[in-house]
Amino acid sequence: VPGTAAIANAIFDATGVRFRQPPFTPDVVRAALNPPPAELARPPRRRKGGLATFGAVLAGVVGVAGAIIGLRPAVEPVVHTDPSIYTAVTIERGRQLAAAGDCAVCHTAPGGNPNAGGRAMATPFGTVYTTNLTPDPETGIGHWSFSAFQRAMREGISRDGKHLYPAFPYTAFTRISDDDLMALYAYLMTQPPVRAQVPETRLAFPFGVRPLMAVWNALYLDPGPAPTDAARSAQWNRGAYLVNGVGHCAACHSPRNMVGAEQGGRRYLGGAMVDGWEAPSLTAQSHAPVPWTEGALYQYLRHGHTEQHGMATGPMGPVVKELATLPAADVRAMAHYLASFQSAASPQQAAATAQVLVNRAETRNALLASPAQRLFDSACGACHRDGNGLAQTGRNIPLALNSNLYSEHPDNLLRVVLEGISEPATSELGFMPTFRHSLDDRQIAELAGYMRQRFAPGRPPWRDLEAAAKRIRQNPSTH
């Protein structure tokens, strides 16, 4: 644990007790968070009342120590560096890294200047506002040295010594190499400075006590660049570096525990809810009706759609826009790495499965004559026709292949119906109107239920669709 000597000295000054081994090491804390199965109940042994007192004092000491170890020194400010010291090659490399990391996606407020911060990010602990990444000396990072920038990316510590919250995914960025961090720093420092004071992040107690993040980091942060896997190919390692490092895919696609840390193991990339959208599993646990192949993953990440799964909408739309500016080899490496978590289906097998699903949906049409079908025909038929994917305006994937219809959660489908698609990942994908003002919650629920029954007949009906439609209507997304 960083600052062990300082903690021990502080405890000695306060209590007169000298600890040779602090009682709050990461192993001890992990053991407390994950206790072993309880043994059979035994009659309690009588202890002196002082044991409870000692436990209370120890708990207090741990809390104080957490605050002590959270104090980090500030890095001295520097005069804004002359941008001409960086080569065009370095700056372009930094631009690509910023695109892979979607820096502008999170650090740009709606209608604001790129990277000037201020976007509100809802978390279970409160709203986090993204910071100004432009080289403005007063409100941005203009006074940040490279060492300050590196510390923030590797350790989650701001230039002034304050802890950053893991809504800024430094647990992934810590894996970025020194050379790439320097290139990213060079790119950011050569962008136009924007004076923009962002709102202050205030989280509920105790999450708003930033020094306590030192304990969180001791448990969940593994600082330093990630090593390569010698047993894997160069392409696989490049993909792993981009996905798990600057791309921080797990920040959205892995579920988090009760204190906001990404879960690994079988839950790695296993899907999660982010900003009201479902970020689906990127592994073989995916609810997609057609297995993802390496080619389909590349097509989706590069162009924002695949004929066997659907289109990138919601938060993935801006991600695809950024990935489209990367070298094709990098996107292929990401697809290659992600494909290693999928079932081994060939492109021919995937195509055959897709055709079966489309044919099944067409034959079920006559069996489902109902008011909901008439609602679908009037609201959706102009573009989607009979759900068979005939293109009217832009790309149109058969609804029987749309992954959202096979999910356990109706949220993504309901959001698209209510909010439409006003900013597609690419212009060729086309737009979709919003039905927020033309359909009420009951109609939205009937429409979603019909689409689930017809186009994903093997899946159980969604429950409480009207309540879900009302909830989503009242909580619009920021993407």
Where are these regions (language model features)?
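Cofactor-binding beta-sheet edge motifs in enzyme active sites
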Residues: 1-69
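Hydrophobic, well-ordered secondary-structure elements that form the walls
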Residues: 7, 11, 16, 383, ...
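Ser/Thr/Pro/Gly-rich low-complexity linker/stalk segments immediately outside membranes or between
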Residues: 69-93
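Flexible coil segments in periplasmic/lumen-exposed cytochrome c-class electron-transfer proteins
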Residues: 76-81, 108-126, 159-240, 244-245, ...
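Aromatic- and charge-enriched surface segment that lines or borders ligand/interaction sites
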Residues: 139-157, 161, 174, 290-294
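C-terminal structural cap/anchor segments
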Residues: 371-409
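Extended, polar beta-sheet/loop recognition surfaces of beta-rich domains
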Residues: 399-442, 446
